[in-house]
C-alpha cells in the first residue's frame, strides 16, 4: 500500500499520455502528505496555431495517437472536479510570436526568438499575454492540493 510521504509530485507533458488520468491522479494523491501538491503541465487543446491560425502543418504535427487525451481549460477542470480536492488551473504561453510566424510561413517549428530582435521583447510579451488572456495559449498548468 502506498505510503503518504511526498510534499510535491511534478510531471510535465505526461498526463495526456495516460489512458486513465483520473485514476493516475488519485494514485498520486495517495502518495502525498496532507497539504501536499501535484503540479503538472500539459498542452492546451486550444493552442493558437490550431484554434486561431488553423495552420495545417501544425495540425499534422500536434494531433498524435500517443495522446489518448487532449485537454482544454474546461475539460481539465471537469477532470479535476472528480478528485475531491482543491485545485488551480493556470494558463501559459511557452512559444513566442516569432515561432508562430515561422509556423505560418514555413509550416514547421523552429522560430523561437527568430524575429524578437527585429520586433521587441515588449511585443513578444504582449502577444503571449493576449493569448493567455483569451485562453488561446499553448499550455495548461494544474496545481492540485491534498486536503
Give the positions of each predicted feature.
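Generic structural "secondary-structure junction" signal
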Residues: 51, 63-65, 99
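Short, flexible, glycine/charge-rich loop motifs used to bind or transfer phosphoryl groups or to couple energy/partner
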Residues: 1, 58-59, 131-132
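Short glycine/proline- and charge-enriched loop/turn segments
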Residues: 54-63, 103-111
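Residue-level detector of flexible, active-site-proximal loop/helix-junction positions
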Residues: 46, 59, 75, 94-97
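Short linear motifs at secondary-structure transitions and domain/linker junctions
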Residues: 14, 44-47, 61-62, 114-122
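A C-terminal cap/extension of S-adenosyl-L-methionine-dependent methyltransferases
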Residues: 89-147
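Conserved SAM-binding loop
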Residues: 1-55, 69-82, 139-146
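Soluble, non-transmembrane catalytic domains of enzymes that act on hydrophobic metabolites at membranes
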Residues: 57-64, 70, 82, 88-93
